[in-house]
């Protein structure tokens, strides 16, 4: 019965343009819904580190060869192809289009040497 009242209150508050009262906010918060003021805020979490134990299971999606973790750049490196996959919030982005080239092509090296 109480949960039904919470649902009706939440529905009624969502339909109004006026900000909900403090009592209504507490009811919504108790029902598991986040208050409107908190919806746009991001929680400050410390950045997650990459777990090197995952290297045992991860391979380059292009060459199927093992990868090397480079802590200074926070990337997984494929030495053979000369590409680096970024690690974002502790999660490797293994999409080939997201990888960056670590080696310059011969044509670029020649242009820079001139």
Curated annotation (Swiss-Prot):
Transit peptide: 1-35
Coiled coil location: none
Nucleus listed as a keyword: no
UniProt xrefs under InterPro entries: Trm112-like
Record Pfam families: Trm112p (PF03966)
Record keywords: Mitochondrion, Transit peptide
Domain TRM112, residue spans: 51-97
Renumbered residue ranges of the record's region Disordered: 14-49
Superkingdom assignment: Eukaryota
Complex formation: Interacts (via TRM112 domain) with NDUFAF5; the interaction is direct and stabilizes NDUFAF5 protein. Interacts with COQ5; the interaction is direct, stabilizes COQ5 protein and associates PYURF with COQ enzyme complex.
Protein name: Protein preY, mitochondrial
Encoding gene, per UniProt annotation: PYURF
């Amino acid at each position: 019965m109480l949960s039904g009242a919470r649902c009706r209150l939440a529905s009624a508050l969502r339909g109004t343009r006026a900000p909900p009262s403090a009592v209504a906010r507490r009811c919504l918060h108790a029902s598991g819904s986040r208050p409107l003021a908190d919806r746009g805020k991001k929680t400050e979490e410390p950045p997650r580190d990459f777990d090197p134990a995952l290297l045992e299971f991860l391979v380059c999606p292009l060459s199927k060869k093992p990868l090397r973790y480079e802590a200074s750049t926070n990337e997984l490196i494929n030495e053979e192809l000369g590409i680096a996959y970024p690690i974002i919030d502790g999660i490797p982005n293994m999409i080939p289009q997201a990888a960056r080239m670590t080696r310059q092509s011969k044509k670029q090296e020649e242009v820079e040497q001139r």
